Amino acid sequence: MPSSISVKLVAAESLYKRDVFRSPDPFAVLTIDGYQTKSTSAAKKTLNPYWNETFKFDDINENSILTIQVFDQKKFKKKDQGFLGVVNVRVGDVLGHLDEDTATSSGRPREETITRDLKKSNDGMAVSGRLIVVLSKLPSSSPHSQAPSGHTASSSTNTSSTTRTNGHSTSSTRNHSTSHPSRGTAQAVESTLQSGTTAATNTATTSHRSTNSTSSATRQYSSFEDQYGRLPPGWERRTDNFGRTYYVDHNTRTTTWKRPTLDQTEAERGNQLNANTELERRQHRGRTLPGGSSDNSSVTVQVGGGSNIPPVNGAAAAAFAATGGTTSGLGELPSGWEQRFTPEGRAYFVDHNTRTTTWVDPRRQQYIRTYGPTNTTIQQQPVSQLGPLPSGWEMRLTNTARVYFVDHNTKTTTWDDPRLPSSLDQNVPQYKRDFRRKVIYFRSQPALRILPGQCHIKVRRKNIFEDAYQEIMRQTPEDLKKRLMIKFDGEEGLDYGGVSREFFFLLSHEMFNPFYCLFEYSAYDNYTIQINPNSGINPEHLNYFKFIGRVVGLGVFHRRFLDAFFVGALYKMMLRKKVVLQDMEGVDAEVYNSLNWMLENSIDGVLDLTFSADDERFGEVVTVDLKPDGRNIEVTDGNKKEYVELYTQWRIVDRVQEQFKAFMDGFNELIPEDLVTVFDERELELLIGGIAEIDIEDWKKHTDYRGYQESDEVIQWFWKCVSEWDNEQRARLLQFTTGTSRIPVNGFKDLQGSDGPRRFTIEKAGEVQQLPKSHTCFNRVDLPQYVDYDSMKQKLTLAVEETIGFGQE
């Protein structure tokens, strides 16, 4: 039986701003089944309009489609009509069966508040934001004549009322509503809806009339029957947002387009289940961001709402599930739960048992499903079992209903659910997956949040060490936790990430240079460095070590890599772990071999050693006791193990105790000691320095092209040139284009830009006589379309090895 409903359009938020210098004047057009049309007033110059206007719609059934479109009044007469987004809502999905008694215990109509993300139309124009809508079924009134479904809007005379916040009420027909922004706008709205220029309204109108035109004038069927008779037990008939009928089997929690029959066998039902599963998988594979590339190694997260989601229109289904909206018929909330509403009208749920809140309706079991590189399900967990997101995290949906996550602590985004294990390829080493989980936890801690404001540091390239020392040491730790803004003297470049990456790259080369006597190369090789025990030759050495500790902490805090590797023992010392004999191998291989030989062989009568060590200090040999009166205690087979432990402790730790303490004082001013202990020494090395080895195939795999395609000759020449270079030249190219020669542990897929992860990009730009130009903040290189390989290689090499400094376009 047809019913009447009330639709209150509360507000919209975060609308898309198409003009740089002005905000839109948004108004909304509400349409039921394509022939009942209402319009709100226009809110002036805002991206967050607040209407709070109520509309009444008659002759509604649960299959009716409510379409809400948002336009910019200033542009409504233009070609695109100032389109700002559309939302389609099936009334039955929100209010349930309209023939049921849905009144509350107080006799007032039950209201359902929903929040829906705005969607694109067929023209593909970018939209953003969401609508807050309140729907309620009105009490039954006296019978009235029903207009035939074949009548157009211009011939109908049904009346409705429009209620606004100021209390005024006016009467309007379908053609003319006094609540329209203007008379011209109202006529334009009507003509637009009749001509079908808006794809969403046109689709809903066509599908509704095609399916219901023959039956709506005679009888309205319930969800459990149709013109062919009653459905089998446990089956229900529903209509998606485009008016297409599908069937829900509540027995198996599956959906199908095929109408079930009473004699349907279990085998047929099983085949249908498999078919639906495969259909859902194919739909999921096709979900990508607009303009994005489909990468088999990436992981897609899908939110589902059980049997309430039809087998098509996954975008609307995922958007509905993400809002955590309720559906009538779900029953009472579990014990200890309460439903509340935000000031914007969005429903949320309070669990008084655990004193937590969630957007997810506990009566609706939602799943987060993770797909692997072969598009097979590798994880499926209920949202309720995953628990809340870490502090500062938020889950959002793209325009294509793909779930992504926002880390407000670091102002970055990611596809990966921070509550789930690593979404890396399944063939990567286990330590990388473990490391990623630890990093997510580490970054989510309140102490690692970037504070409001900016920290400005200005340095000269030729005096970067001393200038950085003066700038960083004069700042308080709280100031250093604000967003870093690095400025090179005499250069115009703005720091959106690339300048600061180059700052840390250049500074690490200077402050770890043995020329300053603060660090020295290990005896094992000339690549790893260790603290110089004779750094005291510089009377200010402890202040410099505190400064270096601050720089390392700054790099970790702001996600910047340092171009240096310490000996492994230093990372263990930072974690307060005890050093052992194996750590000596990276410090001095000859000493390690000698101590190891002592443990494996008898030394009685062979070695004449005591519990002391000789330390050379600027040409003077000083004897140091490893234990009290150690120089008079002989080393034997019985106590040689103790000697090895004491000598290792002295050789690695005790000689540099003062310098290391100053270093850690500076480091812990930005990174609390208890947080960094979640890592082991190998992971801490990756956290500070990233990975130096460059994988060309991984680089190519995670590269985007603008103006070029991967098959273009210039691109082939570029990768041929990179392949011919050695690792040092590749590192220089990476530093030229991104500001650092290091890459994250997850490879090029996790390269960071100015606003979060940003892939390496090659753009077609510049004249052939020009050198390539880099944009380090955006990991982008402008590569002209050179005419031959030799000229491209020559100019690329010249740009990488000879250019210096930042400019501004």
From Swiss-Prot:
Q: Where are stretches of biased composition, namely Polar residues? A: 139-148, 184-196
Residue ranges with Low complexity bias:
149-183, 197-219
| Any one Gene Ontology molecular-function term assigned to this protein's record | ubiquitin-ubiquitin ligase activity
Keywords recorded for this protein, A-Z: Cytoplasm, Cytoskeleton, Isopeptide bond, Nucleus, Repeat, Transferase, Ubl conjugation, Ubl conjugation pathway
What changing residue 537 to D does, per the record, is: Has defects on both initial ubiquitination and chain elongation of substrate proteins
Looking at the record, the residues that make up the C2 domain are 1-105
Biased composition regions of type Basic and acidic residues, renumbered to the chain: 108-122
Q: PTM details?
A: The ubiquitination appears to be the result of an intramolecular transfer of ubiquitin.
Pfam families, alphabetized: C2, HECT, WW
Q: Which family does the UniProt entry place this protein in?
A: Belongs to the RSP5/NEDD4 family.
Tell me more from the record: A cysteine residue is required for ubiquitin-thioester formation.
Stated role: E3 ubiquitin-protein ligase which accepts ubiquitin from an E2 ubiquitin-conjugating enzyme in the form of a thioester and then directly transfers the ubiquitin to targeted substrates. Component of a RSP5 ubiquitin ligase complex which specifies polyubiquitination and intracellular trafficking of the general amino acid permease GAP1 as well as other cell surface proteins like GAP1, FUR4, MAL61, PMA1 and STE2.
User: What protein is this chain from?
Assistant: E3 ubiquitin-protein ligase RSP5
